[in-house]
């Protein structure tokens, strides 16, 4: 998948240094993925929450951090639209 809007994730890492390894690992896994359907995401990330409008919430580092994305399955794009420190 092509991960769009990486700079906000890098800014998040700068603000929350403890998230660095989890966020970078997640980015690497997303870039290697080839999701065609929401079920593909659930197979790879069992704790991900599939929402309406192609949105997905990923829990990182034991749910300490969350990344919200929109997935364009047919185009192979993942758009990061939000992140949070829980």
What positions do the PLM features span?
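Conserved small/polar residues in nucleotide/adenosyl-binding loops
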Residues: 84-86
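Basic, Lys/Arg-enriched alpha-helical interface segments
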Residues: 1-64, 73-77
